[in-house]
Swiss-Prot record:
Protein name in the entry: Cytoskeleton-associated protein 4
Lipid bilayer topology: Single-pass type II membrane protein
Purpose of the protein: High-affinity epithelial cell surface receptor for APF. Mediates the anchoring of the endoplasmic reticulum to microtubules.
Keyword entries, A-Z: Acetylation, Cell membrane, Coiled coil, Cytoplasm, Cytoskeleton, Endoplasmic reticulum, Lipoprotein, Membrane, Palmitate, Phosphoprotein, Signal-anchor, Transmembrane, Transmembrane helix
One Gene Ontology term, aspect cellular component: lipid droplet
UniProt key word Transmembrane helix: yes
Residue numbers bearing the Phosphoserine modification: 3, 17, 19, 211, 292, 367
Transmembrane segments annotated in the record for this chain: 86-108
Subunit structure: Interacts with REEP5.
Record-linked PANTHER family: CYTOSKELETON-ASSOCIATED PROTEIN 4 (PTHR45161:SF1)
Region span, Disordered: 1-73
Species in which this protein is naturally found: Mus musculus
Compositionally biased intervals (Pro residues): 37-53
């Protein structure tokens, strides 16, 4: 019995060793171990039968008690052996079941550990990918900062170019003001000369021929009409130039306002970039919180990459536009330099023309000394030359409007004409002195009449020249004054001339021819000056066209910058 109990206790302890996971087998072993002590108690119920004879029964009872104890011991021994075998079987069976269950549990735990390890590996890989994405975003932010730096440099360059254009506009405005002043001065001088000519004509009207008086009046009316037309043209040019200056000022003011707005936008973009950098630093510290929004972040990164690619393309287009603008400005500066060089060469050309004029004067004097008695042929040749000059000066008449643009330089030619008119006045005074010393004769009167007729023809030719050159009244009026004074003095002194002074009279006629040839050379010089002024006006028009193209490029640049600002704001909102 004790052995059975010990075995039952061992079986119970052996089955309870995997008690954490196999509680039911150990419970069954304990129940089996507890049942054997109940088996020997079954023969005890006959004991309570009361004996009839206590003494005999006591003797019989002792013998029967020993026999029953022996049988009970034998049966208990066999039962204990059987129970031990059963218990051993159950113990081994429980051990095998516990080992199988523990193996299955260990396998399950290993699978869970592998799954957890794979999850940790995926998480670390996602974390590395997220770190690489953040590094790429940092690099993109740095590239954005670099692009913003280049953008600021471009803005500074555009501001410098705009300052240069403003300076050029101011210089043009000052030159236009100077031109307007010169034109006003020229207008006053023309009006003064016209009034002086009217007074001279009124004084000479009493002494002159009636036909000459009528022609002079017609010429004066035509001259006043041409002067009024020129004055109207000058005022229109002044109004147009002032209007263009006001428009340029308004455009410059609008550009300055847009420049201020752009500078504010650049400052806001800088602040936004700084905020983006701060947010990126905070996001690096909050990597664990970004696991849930990893997919959305990847999609945002893809869209941002596409937008950055488009932004890079737009930046390249912006660089190309800036390069084209720079080339246009360089071409404009080169054209301005060439125009300045051509304007600096104008005084040398004028000086050279003056020297050629003096040489022509000397040659004309030498040729006229040898052709004293060939005055009629010379006058015919002079008329043909004047007709040729009229055909040539038709081109000048077509370029009068372009000359008005460069009237500042035309004033120099007018000043030279005034100086030449003074020289003509001096020569006229010399002629008057020569005529005052002369006498009268019939031959001399006929020569004077022929001279008057030739002068009338010359005045008719000069009328056409005045219609084509309305800016040159001083020279023609001085020539008319010479002719009128010569005719009046010849008419007053025609009857008291001595015949022996005929050669002196011819010399005065030669002097008159020389003065006419000098007028012709002066007209040629004026034609060359007008051609140079036309070329200069064409250059000015090309410069104005270049300025307009530069303004158009600046407008395109402003539109590109506005689009770039919109793209950057969209990127900032998405970040």
């Amino acid at each position: 019995m004790p052995s059975a109990k010990q075995r039952g206790s061992k079986g119970g302890h052996g089955a309870a060793s995997p008690s954490d996971k196999g509680a039911h087998p150990s419970g069954g072993a304990d129940d089996v171990a507890k049942k054997p002590p109940a088996a020997p108690q079954q023969p005890q119920p006959p004991a309570p039968h009361p004996p009839q004879h206590p003494q005999n029964q006591a003797h019989r009872g002792g013998h029967r008690g020993r026999s029953s104890a022996a049988t009970a011991n034998a049966s208990s021994a066999s039962c204990s052996r059987r129970l031990g075998r059963v218990l051993n079987f159950l113990f081994y069976l429980s051990l095998v079941a516990a080992a199988a269950f523990s193996g299955w549990y260990v396998h399950h735990v290993l699978e869970e550990v592998q799954q957890v390890r794979r999850g940790h590996q995926d998480f670390s890989r996602q974390r590395d990918e997220l770190g690489q994405g953040l590094q790429g975003v940092e690099q993109k932010v740095q590239s954005l900062q670099a692009t913003f730096g280049t953008f600021e440099s471009l803005l500074r360059n555009s501001q410098h170019k705009q300052d240069l254009t403003e300076k050029a506009v101011k210089e043009g405005e000052s030159e236009l003001n100077r031109i307007s002043e010169v034109l006003q001065k020229l207008q006053n001088e023309i009006l003064k000369d016209l009034s002086d000519g009217i007074h001279v004509v009124k004084d000479a009207r009493e002494r002159d021929f009636t036909s000459l008086e009528n022609t002079v009046e017609e010429r004066l009316t035509e001259l006043t009409k041409s002067i009024n037309d020129n004055i109207a043209i000058f005022t229109d040019v002044q109004k147009r130039s002032q209007k263009e200056i006001n428009e340029v000022k308004m455009k410059v003011a609008s550009l300055e306002e847009s420049k201020g707005d752009r500078s504010q936008d650049v400052k806001t973009l800088k602040d936004a970039v700084k905020e983006v950098q701060a947010s990126m630093m905070s996001r690096e510290r909050d990597i664990e919180a970004l696991k849930s929004s990893l997919q959305t972040m990847e999609s945002d990164v893809y869209t941002e990459v596409r937008e950055l690619v488009s932004l890079k393309q737009e930046q390249q287009a912006f660089k190309q536009a800036a390069d084209s603008e720079r080339l246009a400005l360089q071409a404009l500066t080169e054209k301005l330099l060439r125009s300045e060089e051509s304007s600096s060469r104008l005084p040398e050309d004028i000086r050279r023309l003056e020297e050629e004029l003096q040489q022509l004067k000397v040659g004309a004097h030498g040729s006229e000394e040898g052709a004293v008695f060939k005055d009629s042929k010379a006058l015919e040749e002079l008329q043909r030359q004047i007709e040729g000059l009229g055909a040539r000066l038709q081109y000048v008449e077509d370029g009068v409007y372009s000359m008005q643009v460069a009237s500042a330089r035309h004033t120099e030619s007018l000043e030279s004409l005034l100086s030449k008119s003074q020289e003509y006045e001096q020569r006229l005074a010399m002629l008057q002195e020569h005529v005052g010393n002369l006498g009268s004769s019939s031959d001399l009167a006929s020569t004077v009449r022929s001279l008057g007729e030739t002068q009338l023809a010359l005045s008719s030719d000069l009328k056409e020249l005045k219609q084509s050159l309305g800016e040159l009244p001083g020279t023609v009026e001085s020539l008319q004054e010479q002719v009128l004074s010569l005719l009046s003095q010849d008419q007053a002194q025609a009857e008291g001339l001595p015949p022996q002074d005929f050669l002196d009279r011819l010399s005065s006629l030669d002097n008159l021819k020389s003065s006419v040839s000098q007028v012709e050379s002066d007209l040629k010089m004026l034609r060359t000056a007008v051609d140079s002024l036309v070329a200069y006006s064409v250059k000015i028009e090309t410069n104005e066209n270049n300025l307009e193209s530069a303004k158009g490029l600046l407008d395109d640049l402003r539109n590109d910058l506005d689009r770039l600002f919109l793209k950057v704001e969209k990127i900032h909102e998405k970040i």
